[in-house]
């Protein structure tokens, strides 16, 4: 197969998740909510062997697959919602781009030709396109993405309908005390390409849309693209002033009680099928892991 895997590596199977949770409990880990995490940081409690589960965007498999498993094991978790993906007003372009690259040996993007015959070339092409897209300003972002998808006969809205939850799923989940919803912006823009006002508008609009649906205040936020390339001091300071209790990035790392002063740039650890509990054991001393 010529399928490439950047997006596939960001998810795990239901079987793996169920087994992983069982193994965590067998090894003495406590699975806590984002609110418990913040309380522990604030009180400087001993936080050895504690795990927080977080999920981004609002994928349908969060509802269909992950939720029943979390419910079965009584595990709290947080979903950072992007309303634009939930209401189908924007595209999850990263999945569409991967499909286009997988199915073609040569592609054109923004008037440039990229060869992608081998698996290595396809993987490289994905990261090249991703890098180019994340450097587009707000006015170019969807224009160039949508043009690329149309040129390749991709119906992104149809694809999104199969990938993401609907508001009815969100409302149902919000009635369960195990579930906390956070915000992930309205349109999933890379925030470092927006002005301060545009960032604030993106975040506040997302909050309002989610709060209107679930009738609860949104207190937590995840950057839509959260590496050191997209999130720096400027973006962190803006979010720090918007009243969130916590803000998470995708920078790799565990959480210490010292993060009390850095609650608006918390690191996380990506859970993959290759993740082993022993890896936590090597780095868990006096830390909380967010997954």
Predicted regions and their residues:
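Generic alpha-helical structural signal
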Residues: 18, 64, 127, 142, ...
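Acidic (Asp/Glu)-rich catalytic clusters
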Residues: 25, 69-73, 165-183, 256-260
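Acidic/aromatic-lined carbohydrate-recognition and catalytic surfaces
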Residues: 48-110, 114-117
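Electropositive, surface-exposed helix/loop patches at the edges of structured domains
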Residues: 64-69, 73-76, 113-132, 280-291
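A short acidic, amphipathic alpha-helical/loop segment
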Residues: 65-69, 169, 234-238
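Structural detector of well-ordered beta-strand residues that form the stable sheet scaffold
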Residues: 78-80, 181-182, 245-248
